[in-house]
């Protein structure tokens, strides 16, 4: 058949590129793992992983670094998806941080994120002896991610040096590393937030319902709407929890993640909203505003 008779949408091309990258990782690395944070990008990655190796089960496990402060609904969704898909899931909690009672309320966003997420991830990768960790970061999210390679090399201490990365020519990736080094791989690098939602709509991928607008109890704090997800969130003097129509564009630890006021309760509504919004999804991440806690500095220390 004449190749000119084929028509590929931009989503088809993005899907093909991501599946190629996933297969390349499995072929080139000794012990890869997929970082599953339970968000929309992770949900797309899991769907692509299942597609890439169907009808066989995925040949690599999923890894979730649990800070113990994720939204309750995220954990319930994670467990349901693992049961539905049959994938192997590893859950890691930084027990040293637990022993120190590290939390975002008492210790703040920067300390909590560093100990429970960054150090927790480094522990999990070392314990599992993983040489490649697949993540869902995209270049449109934030300026430091915009300059990161698809194959992002980390030294033996998991540190990222943005000035010491390898060139990537077309779809040719260099997977050679020295003992102790590792690579973070980002198959969704060339996707946008809108692409992710269009693909979720086309493929009917399940996502956490927190992405859809609904009346939820929130307090306004530091210019953000914080969901009162459980009794661990203390109200400040004068604060009152109110039901407001909100949804989340990004998900993380609930005291550090701001909701946005919205009536987008369906995938079609979310896509329509994405077409007109002028703001980045990371406007709702409190950690990005912490002094000395820029995304680049966190990534240099080993962050996702």
From Swiss-Prot:
Reaction equations catalysed: sulfate + ATP + H(+) = adenosine 5'-phosphosulfate + diphosphate
One biological process term in Gene Ontology: hydrogen sulfide biosynthetic process
GO function term, MF aspect, one: sulfate adenylyltransferase (ATP) activity
Gene3D superfamilies registered for this protein in UniProt: HUPs
Biological pathway: Sulfur metabolism; hydrogen sulfide biosynthesis; sulfite from sulfate: step 1/3
EC number: 2.7.7.4
Coiled-coil region: none
A Pfam short name: PAPS_reduct
Keywords tagged on the record: ATP-binding, Nucleotide-binding, Nucleotidyltransferase, Transferase
Keyword Signal among record annotations: no
InterPro entries according to UniProt: PAPS_reduct_dom (IPR002500), Rossmann-like_a/b/a_fold (IPR014729), SO4_adenylTrfase_ssu (IPR011784), Sulfate_adenylyltrnsfr_sub2 (IPR050128)
Top-level EC class: transferase
Function: With CysN forms the ATP sulfurylase (ATPS) that catalyzes the adenylation of sulfate producing adenosine 5'-phosphosulfate (APS) and diphosphate, the first enzymatic step in sulfur assimilation pathway. APS synthesis involves the formation of a high-energy phosphoric-sulfuric acid anhydride bond driven by GTP hydrolysis by CysN coupled to ATP hydrolysis by CysD.
Similarity comment: family membership: Belongs to the PAPS reductase family. CysD subfamily.
NCBIfam families found in the cross-reference section: CysD, PRK05253.1, PRK12563.1
Quaternary structure annotation from Swiss-Prot or TrEMBL: Heterodimer composed of CysD, the smaller subunit, and CysNC.
Name of this protein: Sulfate adenylyltransferase subunit 2
Organism: Xylella fastidiosa (strain Temecula1 / ATCC 700964)
Lineage: Bacteria, Pseudomonadati, Pseudomonadota, Gammaproteobacteria, Lysobacterales
Gene designation per UniProt: cysD
């Amino acid at each position: 058949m004449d190749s000119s008779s084929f028509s590929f949408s931009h989503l088809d091309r993005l899907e093909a590129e991501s599946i190629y990258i996933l297969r390349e990782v499995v072929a080139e690395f000794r012990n890869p793992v997929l970082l599953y944070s339970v968000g929309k990008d992770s949900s797309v990655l899991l769907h692509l992983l299942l597609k890439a190796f169907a009808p066989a089960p995925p040949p690599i496990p999923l890894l979730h670094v649990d800070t113990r402060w994720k939204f309750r609904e995220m954990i319930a969704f994670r467990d349901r998806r693992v049961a539905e898909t049959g994938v192997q899931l590893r859950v890691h909690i930084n027990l040293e941080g637990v022993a120190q009672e590290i939390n975002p309320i008492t210790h703040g966003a920067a300390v909590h994120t560093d100990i429970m997420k960054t150090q927790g991830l480094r522990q999990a990768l070392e314990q599992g002896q993983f040489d490649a960790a697949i993540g869902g970061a995209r270049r449109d999210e934030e300026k430091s991610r915009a300059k990161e390679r698809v194959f992002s090399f980390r030294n033996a201490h998991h540190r990222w040096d943005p000035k010491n990365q390898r060139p990537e020519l077309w779809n040719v990736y260099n997977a050679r590393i020295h003992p102790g080094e590792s690579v973070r791989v980002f198959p969704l690098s060339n996707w946008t937030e809108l692409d992710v939602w269009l693909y979720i709509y086309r493929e009917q991928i399940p996502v956490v319902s927190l992405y859809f607008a609904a009346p939820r109890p929130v307090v306004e704090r530091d210019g953000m709407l914080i969901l009162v997800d459980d009794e661990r969130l203390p109200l400040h003097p004068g604060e009152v929890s109110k039901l407001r129509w909100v949804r989340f564009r990004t998900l993380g630890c609930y005291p550090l993640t701001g909701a946005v006021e919205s009536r987008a309760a369906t995938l079609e509504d979310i896509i329509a909203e994405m077409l007109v919004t002028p703001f980045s999804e990371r406007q709702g991440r409190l950690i990005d505003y912490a002094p000395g806690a820029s995304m680049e500095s966190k990534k240099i220390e080993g962050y996702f």
